[in-house]
Amino acid sequence: MVKNKFIKFFALFLLSLLTFSCGTINRLNDSNNNISIEQKIKRYIKLYAPIARKQMKVYKIPASVTMAQGILESGYGESTLAKKGNNHFGIKCHKGWKGKKIFHDDDKENECFRSYNNPLKSYKDHSLFLANRDRYRFLFDLNSKDYKSWAEGLKKAGYATDPEYSKKLISLIERFNLSQLD
């Protein structure tokens, strides 16, 4: 009888310990996920900010906007397009694209996106994509330090279908102080 009570007590103790531990682990994972996303974004900025600044000097596109687009479009470098195709800006193939391709579900199923050998080529193509398309031409009349007008202009020109696109870019720029790159 004492043995049965001990076994029941021990089983109840283990069950309580396990329940408490799982709750604590889940709370730790939740807070680590928030911190880890922030850290991943900061790591992305540290890694790609020099490229964005170089592109700004050549093409006059604010580095803050380029960085915010890269963070948003690539999921801070963690998206399938970024990992498998080095596409950090969600640029689709469009007419005349003769480079590498990757297919991915987006607005439609199995859409064609540009694929690059490395992220640097993605950043350069992003600059060329904006600089060489008529629908973005008006952006280059804006002050290159006016990230808000650039973000709103990208949305107006149809860069993305998300109605909150410019707000998301501006939020990233302000949250991570990306305007210091301009």
Write out the residue ranges for each language-model feature:
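Bacterial N-terminal signal peptides
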Residues: F10-T19
